[in-house]
């Protein structure tokens, strides 16, 4: 199985996303893990400028990964899911929050 980290910054370019997904869709088994992109960057900025709590900032960055994953699912037939299984865009928040 391929585990693919899909950088959140890629959501700026829909054509690139479509090309990447065209290749991924040909794989037999994969798991896509989205990055947080600009959403996570904004959380980190607020962490620094607004003196946010570290745990709250960390959790918000995980939620940013979910947001990017949902946006990515718009460009492919691959479904976004909170369930850790093959051939999905993994939304990690529930898995990570439940493991704390």
Identify what each model region corresponds to.
Residues 1-100:
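Nucleotide/pyrophosphate-binding catalytic subdomain
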